[in-house]
């Protein structure tokens, strides 16, 4: 029995050993294939992660996978090394910013400096730029719209008066940038002073306006015209007064007064002009008008008027002697002696007898025309004056004189000397002489009878 049991035990041991050996043999023959097909969970995870690491190149990825295959027990270590290398090769955020295209960079900078975006809005737009740089222009446009819509409205704080002042000051052309900004800041600081600030701005704008030569006021224009026609100013003086008018039109009256004073001071003296007039006008007038009158009127009157001819002498004498005497001695004397004397003495050469007038200081064309019985336009036309007010002392003007009616009658009388109508006094004298002769004949006849 004992032997039988021992045999059985031995037989069982051999069987177990055989089975074990077979198992070992079988296991040793299929190990590489089983390892490749049946990775444990750690190996599988490591394999999957290494395949999806974006920053590994192909050689690096294949090397890590081969290491996992070679020694699955080192899967955790291999995976750790792969992750480190992947992280070290990952692109930095700053580097990405530096690689933005030009539009993206510009948009990024502008959005960062938009004052009316809050932090969340700004970060949202920047993230959109990072996600899709090709949309930089659109993202920037949206950011600008939002920034403008959230800007504080300046007009909401201005009242109507302030708004008007603000607008007017902005459009004042003669203020410089600093002045304009100063007034606008004052408007913002105190809107209640809008009217006063606007008034000050207007004054400053007007004071700095360029002076326009063609915008003379009426007073300035008058002074300008008169100074141009002052005959005794030289060119330099005239230009000086005109420049003063341009510089300050408000003192036009004072400038004109100074110009007139200087013009009068430089006028030619009248002493030289009066002497010929006195000699020509007064002395000849007295000699021609008084002496001949006395001789012609009084002597024949005395001879004729006592005995025979009271009737003939007095009546005709009064009519013929006095009236003609007055006409001949006084009127012609005044005309020939006094008027020409005044004209020759006071206004030198107003008329020299040949229809020529010599201009004296103070003369105007209108005055000359009135004195000579013509018109200013006629004088201007005859002398080809461009401006009838532009005449100078000493200038000779042709005057087409129209004589008064009494002169015309005198001329007619002078044109008929044969009839005795030239001078009524001559007719009276002849008549008186005949009367005397007749009286003398009668007187002689009576004496003979006696």
Swiss-Prot record:
Ranges: Immunoglobulin-binding region E repeats: 37-92
Record motif LPXTG sorting signal, residues: 416-420
Pfam families, per this entry?
B, Gram_pos_anchor, LysM, Octapeptide, YSIRK_signal
State a GO cellular component annotated for this protein.
extracellular region
SMART domains the record matches: LysM
Task: Locate the region 12 X 8 AA approximate tandem repeats.
Answer: 268-355
Q: Where are the Immunoglobulin-binding region B/C repeats?
A: 212-269
The membrane-topology field of this record reads: Peptidoglycan-anchor
- A Gene Ontology MF term for this entry? IgG binding
Q: What is its main location?
A: secreted
Q: Which residues carry this modification: Pentaglycyl murein peptidoglycan amidated threonine?
A: 419
Task: List every stretch annotated Disordered.
Answer: 260-365, 401-421
Q: Where is the composition biased (Basic and acidic residues)?
A: 260-354
Q: Where is the signal peptide?
A: 1-36
Q: What PROSITE patterns does this protein's entry cite? A: GRAM_POS_ANCHORING, LYSM
Record key words, sorted: Cell wall, IgG-binding protein, Peptidoglycan-anchor, Repeat, Secreted, Signal, Virulence
Use in biotechnology or industry: Important immunodiagnostic reagent because of its ability to bind the Fab and Fc fragments of a wide range of mammalian immunoglobulins.
* sequence repeat boundaries on the chain: 268-275, 276-283, 284-291, 292-299, 300-307, 308-315, 316-323, 324-331, 332-339, 340-347, 348-355
Q: What does this protein do?
A: Plays a role in the inhibition of the host innate and adaptive immune responses. Possesses five immunoglobulin-binding domains that capture both the fragment crystallizable region (Fc region) and the Fab region (part of Ig that identifies antigen) of immunoglobulins. In turn, Staphylococcus aureus is protected from phagocytic killing via inhibition of Ig Fc region. In addition, the host elicited B-cell response is prevented due to a decrease of antibody-secreting cell proliferation that enter the bone marrow, thereby decreasing long-term antibody production.
Read off the domain note: Each of the immunoglobulin-binding region repeats can bind the Fc region of an immunoglobulin.
Q: How does it assemble?
A: Interacts with host TNFRSF1A; this interaction leads to the stimulation of both surface expression and shedding of TNFRSF1A.
Extra information = Unlike many other strains of S.aureus, SpA has only 4 Ig-binding domains in Mu50.
Official protein name in the record: Immunoglobulin G-binding protein A
Source organism (scientific name): Staphylococcus aureus (strain Mu50 / ATCC 700699)
